[in-house]
Structure formats: C-alpha cells, structure tokens
C-alpha cells in the first residue's frame, strides 16, 4: 500500500472525527455512514493475473426504509492492486538529476445495494445484495523528488506529467455479510460504531494491466536508443472477495 493511500485513509479518519465532533442530533435515526479500510482479494481467473491483494478505502452509506429492517444504500470502493516505479534521468546528457516514473493500477467499484438487517438495540447483523460497476485503470505519473516526498507547496502541482495507459470496465453483482456494534457512546450525539463486512462479487470480463506483474510492463534497452515501453494487459472476469473494517455513525 502506497504512502498516498495511507495519507488518504488518515484524512478519512480525521474527517470522521471532525464530523463526530459536530452536533448530530438533527441526523435522522434511520441514516447510517461507514468509512473503512478495505482489502480486495482477486478470485478465480482474476487471481491468476493479479496475485497480490489490493488495498484502499470503502465508503458506505444508506438509510433504513421507514426505520425498518431493510436498508437501501450505496457502496464506493477505491483500491490499488498494482505498482511499478523506476528512476529516470532528467536529461539524456546527465544522470545527476533524476525523476521518478510510477505506474499504478487501481480498481474503482460503485455498488447500490439492498440490506436486510437484524438489529438488537445498537448491535446489528446484516446481509447485502448488490449490483454495480467496476472500473479498472492504470495511470503513469512522473514526479521530481519534492513531489515524490510530498514536500511541494500547496499551490504547486502533484506531478510533472500524467497519462492514463489502460482503462476498462465491467458490471458486477454479489452478496455480503457484516455487523456493526458500538465502541464509544455519547449521550447527546449517539454511538460510534465499529463495522466489519465481507463481500463476494462476480465481475464481468475486462481488460486490465497489473503494474506489479512481471512482464506486464516491458522496457527496451536504453543502450539501443530512446526507451520504448510495451504493455501486456490481461483479460478475464473480475471476481473479488473484499474485507472491510472501519468506523461509522
């Protein structure tokens, strides 16, 4: 998991703490929100091309219809499953100044769902039935040392150049099981919950690049002239198993 993903997750937790500090007495009791760390594990033929797990952030929110046992909601996931970096000289004539070229493969998932729930006071156990959309992207960025180490000023760009080198999508559907229980109680603002969830999904066929896979990105020999890059994407169905652990309201 990259430094940027760790920072993103930290910002999410800080944001949740800020929201918790606000007055939530006006929030409807039948509305819920979870922000979680997610591990995305490829399954079946997808796992033969992507042997490593993906790591990212899982946003989940919805409402219980008429405060009953059935919830309707939306789940958003962003997880990185591939990464490849190399140092390149800034100038063809000197290697004293170098840049970092990074290629990252990311999956984005959007899933509306129905959520039957069994509640015992603040404790709840639920199932999920969902269907939605997966987007698999690979992007390459070039950064200097300050940008790579996040030392640039706020008004300065995060990178020198960026290109999308691979993109495809697929529909998915699946089921999930999970639970929520309070870990902190505030009489005025309500409890803070710990959320644990597992999801199994069947994905359609898509073409994708795994930047971490050997042979997916092939570079020519610099001694033979300007470097050329050959991409070798894979194509398969995109089945997944996800585990999410986070906090919610």
Put a short name on every predicted segment.
Residues 29-31, 51-57, 104-110, 123, ...:
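Residues that define the transmembrane beta-barrel architecture of outer-membrane proteins
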Residues 33, 145-204:
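A generic hydrophobic-segment detector
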Residues 43-49, 94-103, 157-166, 228-233:
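Extracellular loop and loop/strand-boundary signature of outer-membrane beta-barrel proteins
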Residues 1-29, 248:
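Cleavable N-terminal export/targeting peptides
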Residues 178-249:
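Predominantly the C-terminal beta-signal and adjacent terminal strand-loop region
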Residues 35-39, 57-63, 78, 110-118, ...:
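Residues on the lipid-exposed face of transmembrane beta-strands in outer-membrane beta-barrel proteins
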Residues 62-152, 156, 168-173, 186:
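Gram-negative (and chloroplast) outer-membrane scaffold detector with strong preference
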Residues 21-71, 242, 246-249:
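Short glycine/proline- and aromatic-enriched beta-strand/turn motifs that initiate or cap beta-hairpins
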């Amino acid at each position: 998991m990259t430094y940027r993903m760790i920072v993103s997750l930290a910002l999410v937790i800080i944001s949740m703490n800020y929201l918790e500090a606000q007055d939530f007495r006006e929030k409807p009791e039948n509305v819920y929100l979870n922000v979680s760390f997610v591990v995305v594990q490829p399954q079946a033929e997808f796992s033969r091309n992507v042997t490593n797990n993906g790591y990212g952030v899982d946003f989940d929110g919805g409402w219980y219809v008429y405060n009953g046992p059935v919830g309707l909601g939306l789940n958003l996931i962003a997880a990185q499953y591939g990464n490849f970096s190399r140092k390149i000289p800034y100038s063809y004539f000197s290697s004293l100044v170098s840049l970092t070229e990074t290629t990252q493969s990311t999956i984005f998932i959007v899933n509306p769902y129905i959520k039957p729930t069994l509640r015992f006071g603040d404790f709840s156990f639920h199932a999920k039935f969902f269907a939605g959309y997966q987007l698999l992207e690979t992007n390459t960025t070039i950064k200097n040392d300050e940008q790579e180490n996040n030392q640039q000023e706020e008004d300065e760009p995060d990178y020198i150049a960026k290109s999308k080198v691979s993109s495809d999508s697929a529909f998915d559907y699946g089921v999930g099981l999970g639970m929520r229980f309070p870990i902190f109680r505030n009489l005025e603002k309500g409890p803070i919950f710990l959320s644990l969830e597992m999801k199994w999904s069947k994905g359609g066929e898509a073409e994708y690049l795994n930047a971490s896979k050997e042979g997916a990105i092939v570079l020519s020999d610099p001694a033979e002239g300007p470097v050329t890059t050959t991409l070798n994407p894979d194509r398969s169905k995109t089945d997944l198993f996800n585990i999410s652990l986070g906090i919610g309201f």
